[in-house]
A protein has these predicted regions:
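Cell-wall glycan-active module
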Residues: 2-7, 22-365
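Bacterial N-terminal signal peptides
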Residues: 11-21
């Protein structure tokens, strides 16, 4: 997923996948799951080096309780593993070379709208609401929270800001779980805290970042046998692992090479995707029309896709080869961001998080 802001990654060696205990689809709460009990268990599971353990435990327990999620060790460790991978439990993590990245983004936007660089630099010399010029603030920016605030001020106060960015702040993720701000804004209903400002600003707080990050990780039903597929979905989008397995089945049935990225259709476009065209090639064997195929693929961002005739018939054909085709695989997506300086993939991210999850489960014993 190409974004101006992509989740942070910490270098570790890729480990082999281990079979997980428990079903990854079970996220409903149990009657005995009291907030105090969840907090107590979190204090046991949090890594030893985490500061303000009570604060982290309280915010995470609140998210589980208010969202009705099962606070099993599997689920709690999954949340802690993602948080450790993304920010090492820093509510406002520093990003290396963020000032340079920000200036490059501004220059890119200026070139795109044909605004001379010197005009942009002149506009950035204007004093911002905190008394410092935008240039000064950009030169010293260290975190995405700071950068988001700079862009908010620049867009609201300076005409040049709207020329370059419209009304859209280019910082797209934030907080200790590096959750998408657009996701948070779309899922703000039921947020248990009084919002002092905007949902964007809440994402950069520990309580908000954890609430929306946990919702993104566990707040949807999935029939995954292992949590690692949720970790991949956290990075690539809900149901990306399931959809990538569907794409692989289609590719093997047709001989057509497909990107196993989990994107089944071109959302927002009438043009058929490569996956849809490949499925159409199976139309006669599936006994389905092009329009019926498209309607089924449109459900690819929900659990309902698994109940469609298309899903069932494709896997029925795939299973006839003698070996049952997997219903979930790690998507083959290369991560792109100015913050990433080497080749990383969604599978790399998921495997990293899974390693941390396993270490957390050891602490649960």
């Amino acid at each position: 997923m190409s974004r101006f802001s992509i989740p942070l990654f910490r270098p570790l060696c890729v480990l082999a996948l281990l079979v997980l205990a428990g079903c990854a689809s079970k996220t409903t709460t149990t009657p005995e799951s009291r907030p105090a009990d969840v907090r107590a268990q979190l204090l046991k599971l949090l890594p030893d080096n985490v500061k303000d353990r009570q604060g982290w435990a309280t915010d995470i327990a609140t998210a589980f309780t208010t969202q009705g999620l099962d606070p099993s060790n599997e689920n709690l460790c999954s949340v802690l593993a993602v948080t450790e991978q993304e920010s090492t439990f820093n509510a406002d993590p520093q990003v290396p070379n963020l000032s340079k990245i920000a200036w490059q983004e501004i220059d890119r936007r200026a070139e795109k709208v044909h605004v001379p660089a010197f005009l942009v630099r002149t506009a950035l010399l204007i004093k911002s609401p905190n008394g410092k010029s935008y240039s000064e603030r950009l030169d010293k920016v260290r975190t995405e929270k700071e950068l988001s605030a700079i862009f908010d001020d620049f867009i609201d106060m300076v005409p040049m800001g709207q020329t370059l960015f419209g009304r859209l702040n280019p910082v797209h993720t934030g907080g200790p779980m590096q959750v998408s701000i657009a996701f948070a804004e779309a899922n703000a209903k039921g947020y248990p805290y009084t919002v002092d400002g905007t949902i964007r600003q809440e994402v950069f707080s520990r309580r908000g970042g954890m609430y929306f990050g946990i919702k993104h990780l566990l707040g949807y039903p999935a029939n995954y046998p292992q949590s690692i597929y949720r970790f991949a979905d956290f990075n690539a989008g809900w149901y990306a692992s399931r959809n990538a397995a569907f794409q692989r089945a289609v590719s093997r049935l047709t001989g057509i090479k497909l990107a196993l990225d989990g994107d089944l259709i071109n959302y927002g476009s009438d043009k058929a995707s490569a996956t849809e065209l490949a499925v159409r090639a199976l139309g006669k064997r599936l006994d389905m029309s092009d329009s019926a195929i498209h309607r089924a693929l449109e459900k690819g961002n929900s659990l309902d896709f698994e109940d469609t005739s298309l899903y069932e018939r494709v896997f029925a054909l795939a299973d006839k080869s003698g070996t049952k085709a997997p219903r979930a695989i790690l998507p083959g997506i290369t991560l792109e961001s100015p913050k990433i300086t080497r080749k990383l993939t969604t599978a790399w991210f998921a495997q990293r998080v899974d390693d941390r999850r396993q270490r957390c489960l050891v602490r649960a014993k």
